[in-house]
């Protein structure tokens, strides 16, 4: 689809995602009761204090729920959605395709890698060229053997200070951008200096 045909587009969403890379078991006994609780409105007020201690807040796997939510956006005039769930966060090209077909929404899928805690165990073995090639394949041929192509490079997560691996991923992503012309989405860390890295 051409960008001018997308219509109203949300540019940073995660329809299905696994953010367990952020999970940690809380020290406080009162917060431990939330670890395996389902996400319901009655726990919403507690969320700022337990966001990374509650598995249901970090894992979204329900395709039917996503279809229902996306349908609301489409019915309100939405035309496009950028799903920045990158490799290591549970990116699911087949599920995104299913959601798109069920709702008629154009979904732009991401590529590349997020923060180190979400990197695959073999990331250290991959060269910059390997990562560049992988991202380009996602964009030009599709993810795995699905034929479903990524349309954005990212969300690339960064911490502060940048690790050598994060620098390698950023360089590989930049090289893939130069070759494909695909846009890039970078999520800098929370540190004040992080965006300037």
Residue ranges and their predicted role:
Residues 14-60, 111-129:
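Active-site gating loops and adjacent loop-to-helix segments of metal-dependent hydrolytic enzymes
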Residues 67-82:
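Catalytic domains of carbohydrate-active enzymes, especially glycoside hydrolases
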Residues 40-67, 84-88, 155, 159-163:
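Divalent metal-binding segments
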Residues 60-65, 85-95, 125-137:
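Glycine-rich anion/phosphate-binding loops
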Residues 14-16, 86-87, 112-116, 155-158, ...:
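Active-site beta-loop-alpha junctions enriched in small/polar residues
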Residues 186-197:
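Glycine- and Gly-Pro-enriched alpha-helical subdomains that act as flexible
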């Amino acid at each position: 689809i051409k960008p001018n045909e997308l219509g109203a587009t949300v540019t940073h969403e995660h329809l299905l995602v696994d953010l367990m890379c952020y999970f940690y078991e809380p020290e406080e006994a009162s917060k431990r009761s939330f670890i395996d609780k389902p996400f319901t409105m009655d726990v919403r007020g507690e969320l700022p204090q337990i966001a990374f201690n509650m598995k249901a807040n970090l894992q979204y796997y329900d395709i039917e729920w996503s279809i229902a939510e996306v349908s609301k956006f489409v019915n309100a005039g939405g035309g496009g959605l950028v799903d920045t769930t990158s490799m290591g966060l549970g990116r699911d090209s087949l599920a995104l395709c299913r959601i798109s077909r069920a709702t008629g929404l154009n979904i732009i899928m991401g590529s590349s890698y997020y923060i180190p805690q979400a990197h695959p165990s073999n990331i250290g073995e991959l060269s910059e060229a390997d990562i560049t090639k992988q991202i380009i394949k996602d964009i030009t041929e599709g993810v795995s053997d699905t034929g479903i192509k990524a349309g954005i490079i990212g969300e690339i997560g960064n911490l502060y200070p940048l690790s050598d691996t994060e620098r390698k991923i950023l360089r590989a992503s930049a090289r893939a951008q130069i070759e494909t012309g695909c846009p890039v989405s970078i999520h800098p860390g929370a540190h004040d200096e992080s965006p300037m890295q």
